[in-house]
Curated annotation (Swiss-Prot):
This is 4-diphosphocytidyl-2-C-methyl-D-erythritol kinase. It is an enzyme of class 2 (transferase). The gene is ispE. The keyword Amino-acid biosynthesis does not apply. The active site is at K17, D151.
């Protein structure tokens, strides 16, 4: 008689991110842009529960516990999904992979500029590594993560990091002091490629030569290390912001409202449309989030830095 199959579930959470700084170089011949960015992992997490299945193959579903309103949102559940791709890569690396079902709990906005899909992929890498006893080191997982997308290695790493190249060359930054933010979510997404194309168009129309970014402003890292939101508020930068606002002009109003109601500064997070408002402290963040919510916005107080992908449970069923 064959050995009886016992299903096992490994649950992993991985954080979304805010780009505290994002400088974007000119369009390269390969179609990419070089960037210099400071990533901050924040306390808004995706979760992936990877369950071994007796039948081979990879299946994906979205958990009913997801806090996002996903009506009308097209999330592919096949090989186009980053979590699916991550599981497929791990299956190739593992000696005895089983089938696997991935249940994703969505909390980070889809196409919101916070790396939600990348967090799903990072969580899946870690979950499948544990599920199939692959024994890969964090460094090996990070190498696989880079194959999946520029933001995936950071969600695996977490904390604060400087990203160069296309964002994939990561250097951890020793900045552990808590910074408090209010995230304002939109009820629509912005395509990252569309935002970059819009930026290229704006720059072409201006005829200004854009230098390649080689590093980030050291003042940003100093402010993060010291936990100094006042200084940080003066040096926030996002080269994609004007492109995002060109595509969604209402984002400017949201930033203005946040700053008028007490935020030290506001910016588009990554390619948007999520807005990140920097608060003086956790109390200020909570008050601001509550006020914006009363005004009809979908707002949430978060903090960072937080750790990267972590196993939160491992259960034999």
């Amino acid at each position: 008689m064959g050995e009886r199959f016992h299903a096992r579930t490994v649950r992993v959470k991985a954080p979304g991110k805010v780009n505290v700084s994002l400088s974007v170089g000119p369009l390269r011949p390969d179609g990419y842009h070089s960037v210099a960015s400071v990533y901050l992992a924040v306390s808004l997490y995706e979760e992936v529960a990877a369950t071994s299945t007796e039948a081979p193959g990879i299946t994906v579903s979205i958990s009913p516990d997801s806090t996002l309103d996903l009506d009308g949102v097209d999330i592919p559940l096949d090989q186009r999904n980053l979590a699916y791709k991550a599981a497929a890569i791990m299956a190739e690396m593992s000696e005895k992979p089983t089938g696997v079902h991935l249940e994703i709990t969505k909390r980070v906005p889809v196409a919101g500029g916070m790396g939600g899909g990348s967090a799903d992929a990072a969580a899946t890498l870690l979950a499948c590594d544990a599920l199939w006893n692959s024994g890969l080191s964090r460094e090996e997982l990070a190498h696989l993560a880079a194959e999946l997308g520029a933001d995936v290695p950071f969600s695996l790493l977490g904390g604060t990091a400087v990203g160069l190249g296309v964002g994939d060359k990561l250097s951890p930054a020793l900045a552990k002091a808590q910074m408090d933010w209010v995230l304002v979510f939109a009820d629509y997404g912005l395509s990252t490629p569309d935002v970059f194309r819009t930026l290229d168009g704006l720059r072409d129309s201006e005829g200004v030569e854009i230098p390649e970014p080689v590093d980030v402003d050291p003042t940003i890292l100093q402010a993060l290390r010291k936990g100094d939101p006042e200084t940080l508020s003066r040096v926030l930068i996002n080269d994609l912001q004007r492109a995002s606002i060109t595509l969604a002009p209402q984002l400017r109003d949201t930033i203005g409202l946040g700053e008028a109601r007490g935020a030290l500064a506001g910016m588009v997070s990554g390619s948007g449309p999520t807005i990140a408002l920097l608060a003086r402290d956790s109390v200020s963040a909570s008050v601001l989030a509550e006020e914006l919510t009363h005004r009809g916005h979908n707002a949430l107080a978060v903090h960072g830095p937080v750790p990267g992908a972590r196993i939160i449970s491992d259960t034999l069923l």
